[in-house]
């Protein structure tokens, strides 16, 4: 499985997931008005969102 770890004007960066990590995730955390910290990567289970963010998980390549 290959997950996107970052997106920018220059393109996307990806990582190959380790054994046992079969889910790609993207997590948004609100840092301020219209300002979010976004993290992406591989995981074994879909993390839960906290009160200031949201999480999207999938098990397909490069989403």
Curated annotation (Swiss-Prot):
Coarse class of the protein's main subcellular location: secreted
Listed Pfam families: Toxin_cobra-type
InterPro entries: Snake_3FTx (IPR003571), Snake_toxin-like_sf (IPR045860), Snake_toxin_con_site (IPR018354), Toxin_cobra-type (IPR054131)
Localisation per UniProt entry: Secreted
GO molecular function annotation: toxin activity
Tissue specificity: Expressed by the venom gland.
GO cellular component assignments: extracellular region
Keywords, sorted A to Z: Disulfide bond, Secreted, Toxin
SUPFAM superfamilies according to UniProt: Snake toxin-like
UniProt KW Disulfide bond keyword: yes
Disulfide bonding pattern of the chain: 3-24, 17-42, 46-57
Its job: This protein shows a synergetic toxic effect in that it enhances the toxicity of other D.angusticeps toxins.
Subunit: Heterodimer of C9S3 chain 1 (AC P01408) and chain 2, linked by at least two disulfide bonds.
Protein family: Belongs to the three-finger toxin family. Short-chain subfamily. Aminergic toxin sub-subfamily.
Name of this protein: Synergistic-type venom protein C9S3, chain 2
Species of provenance: Dendroaspis angusticeps
């Amino acid at each position: 499985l290959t997950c996107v770890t970052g997106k920018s004007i220059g393109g996307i960066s990806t990582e190959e997931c380790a054994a046992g990590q079969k889910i790609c995730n993207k997590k948004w955390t609100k840092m301020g008005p219209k300002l979010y910290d976004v993290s992406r990567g591989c995981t074994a289970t879909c993390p839960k969102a906290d009160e200031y963010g949201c999480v999207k998980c999938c098990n397909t390549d490069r989403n």
